[in-house]
Swiss-Prot record:
Its EC number is 3.1.1.29. It comes from Alkaliphilus metalliredigens (strain QYMF). One of its GO terms (molecular function) is peptidyl-tRNA hydrolase activity. The lineage of its organism: Bacteria, Bacillati, Bacillota, Clostridia, Peptostreptococcales. GO terms for biological process: protein quality control for misfolded or incompletely synthesized proteins; rescue of stalled ribosome. This is Peptidyl-tRNA hydrolase. The record marks 9 as: Discriminates between blocked and unblocked aminoacyl-tRNA. NCBIfam families: pth.
Amino acid sequence: MYIIVGLGNPGKKYSGTRHNVGFDVIDLLAHRLGITVNKLKHKALYGEARIGGEKVILAKPQTFMNLSGESIREMMQFYKIDPENLIVIYDDIDVKVGSLRIRQSGSAGTHNGMKSTIYQLQTDAFPRIRIGVGRPEFGDLSNYVLGSFTKDEIPLMKESLERATLTVESIVIDGIDKAMNRYNG
């Protein structure tokens, strides 16, 4: 069994923003799998499905980004999931728009949702998919990540989100190493 978590902020105000691409991937994956992510438990909206015969929980923490780890820890404890069976999907300003970086483990970098997750789990040894949202040339970083994509970025992001869903499926079916070889970039 896997828990697949997309990081984001709850509420319509944040829908479609750079910081919510993790939620976007969960929504796209849920659509592909024919389920809805609408049950509330462990401070998260979630839905259950199967990928390649493997049970998966798709989840969107409702705690706001900086406290995402609380929800993830509760889910992992409830379902008795080891860190290697957790996949976290989130935005990364240090990766160019439209690119993916898949890793087996690693630091949180500047991402507060990942800092919370690593702190709550007391480990950074879990797979993650970083979705590039780029970095502003100038201006406030907070306004940038809470802003929408430009007209030119939208097609790149649609392709990136689709590749991220395929990456999740590949991790579950083929393992992290094959997924990294196939989808990094």
